[in-house]
């Protein structure tokens, strides 16, 4: 089976699983193929998370990270805890990032606009330059291919415009209409 045929098979399989989500599926696959990011907007219960999980689950060998963001989300939840033993023994300030956003190829951040400014600011360089900047640490390359984000609302604060602009692909999903 050619690569093109495999791609169409994945797309058709996703379309059979997720009703009335053809455009969202196509945009999610385009995000993966182009290495860009996608924002999915819609009310609760329209399968935004399900869509991202279904698409990313079909990528073999990719490190996947997912997090529901809140105003209380701290950097350790996204980038891993500080290596306290390394800090105590050698004075090295670094994170244990295995399984975190810092090591992910694909990531899904749900309710992105609910995160606090500290989190949102670090996402600016991760989403654009694929670098994690933290005080006291050299910039760390992040192997991120595509970042998917979802929200029930559009950002109202003008300070969020820069991060919002990082999502070149956007999809507004609504409740399924067919019986």
Region spans (language model):
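Conserved NTP-binding/hydrolysis module of P-loop NTPases
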Residues: 72-89
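Helical mechanochemical/support elements of P-loop NTPase systems and associated helical scaffolds
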Residues: 6, 10, 21-24, 51, ...
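Canonical AAA+ ATPase core
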Residues: 66, 85-90, 106-122, 127-179
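Conserved alpha-helical scaffold flanking the Walker A/P-loop in AAA+ ATPase domains
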Residues: 27-30, 84-107
């Amino acid at each position: 089976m050619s690569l093109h045929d495999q791609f169409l098979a994945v797309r058709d399989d996703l379309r059979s699983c997720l009703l009335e989500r053809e455009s969202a599926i196509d945009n999610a696959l385009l995000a993966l193929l182009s290495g860009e990011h996608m924002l999915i907007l819609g009310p609760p219960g329209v399968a935004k998370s399900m869509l991202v999980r279904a698409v990313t689950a079909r990528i073999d060998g990719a490190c996947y990270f997912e997090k529901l963001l809140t105003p209380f989300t701290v950097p350790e939840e996204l980038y891993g805890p500080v290596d306290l033993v390394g800090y105590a023994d050698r004075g090295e300030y670094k994170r244990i990032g295995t399984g975190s956003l810092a090591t992910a190829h694909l990531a899904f951040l749900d309710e992105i606009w609910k995160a606090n400014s500290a989190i949102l600011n670090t996402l600016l360089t991760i989403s654009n330059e694929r670098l994690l900047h933290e005080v006291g640490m050299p910039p760390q390359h992040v192997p991120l291919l595509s970042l998917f984000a979802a929200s029930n609302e559009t950002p109202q604060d003008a300070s969020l415009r820069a991060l919002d602009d990082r999502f070149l692909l956007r999809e507004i999903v609504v409740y399924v209409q067919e019986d």
